[in-house]
């Protein structure tokens, strides 16, 4: 790994390789050894030198600073189950676990060096030595973006992680991302591009992981994404239907427009084609007059997205009731007498015409048959 400190000297690398080979030999022969994975620590973090191949009948664990077990180099001694004794090299940050591992809290760079453990059993004494390297983490990465004020579906943002590390990860809204059809990460991992930003893109952050399980994150970049309006809803009191609001003269009428938009949109009201000086999303007509009847339009405008929507409503008075139709027939008395006389006279006239017609028909015939009223 590439740490922000001088690299290991060649002899230390050789020592580390020798330690790994020795550990392999010890593991094969059943000897104790210090786990190679625990021989790398990080400044200001806890370091645990893990002891492997520990026998079961341990009487005492003794840890020393250096390659020998001299008394002045002893850090800590632990006799299971509860007897613990600090030594001359104890700094107040060390302890020994029940498994015999050495724990160093708040590791410092000067903790780097050889460590030796001595394990006493009823039959023998085993010893293991390892080189501990405490590294100093590089500073947290920086982050920059070409812009933080964007329009949804139109703009893209390019963010760069300012670091020399090669192990970089990106977080959008605190969630790790590895790229998608909307997001692109450069091959070196240092650049993230979000194409066609969304209203749900709020924060950007990058992180490096030079040491396993230690994540160093950059500061957050807050994105401001303008969006909307998607639509406009219109609420009225009294309620309207099919774009028509029916209200009586002198009654109170309320109109209110609502929409989802960022930033807050501008509102305009138009009455019968004329702009009203009402910049709010609602208006009230406390006492409706004839002059206030007609069409109203609520216009919603987002200056950032340059989107404009509107809704219309027409205020009109109730329709007058239809005239009542009297279905009863009334005829005055004189008219009744007149109609009776007219009917009688008309009937007599019709009978006279019929008799006359019959008489004429009989008298014109070439062969006269006897008429019903003629006798022998």
UniProtKB/Swiss-Prot annotation:
Cystine crosslinks: 257-298
Question: Where's it found, cell-wise?
Answer: Membrane
Under the heading Pfam families, the entry gives: Ig_2, V-set
Q: Topology relative to the membrane, per the entry?
A: Single-pass type I membrane protein
Extracellular topological domain ranges are 31-330
Transport is among the record's keywords:
no
Ig-like C2-type domain ranges (all copies): 229-314
GO CC terms in record: membrane
- Sites carrying a glycan are 69, 95, 110
- Membrane-spanning residues: 331-351
Q: Which residues lie on this side of the membrane: Cytoplasmic?
A: 352-376
Q: Which UniProt keywords apply?
A: Disulfide bond, Glycoprotein, Immunoglobulin domain, Membrane, Signal, Transmembrane, Transmembrane helix
Tissue-specific expression? Mostly expressed in the small and large intestine and at lower levels also in other organs.
Query: Per its UniProt entry, which superkingdom is the organism in?
Result: Eukaryota
Q: Would the keyword Transmembrane helix turn up in this protein's UniProt record? A: yes
| Signal sequence coordinates | 1-30
CDD domains to which the protein is assigned, alphabetical: IgV_CEACAM_D1
Q: Which family does it belong to?
A: Belongs to the immunoglobulin superfamily. CEA family.
In Swiss-Prot or TrEMBL terms, this protein is called Cell adhesion molecule CEACAM18
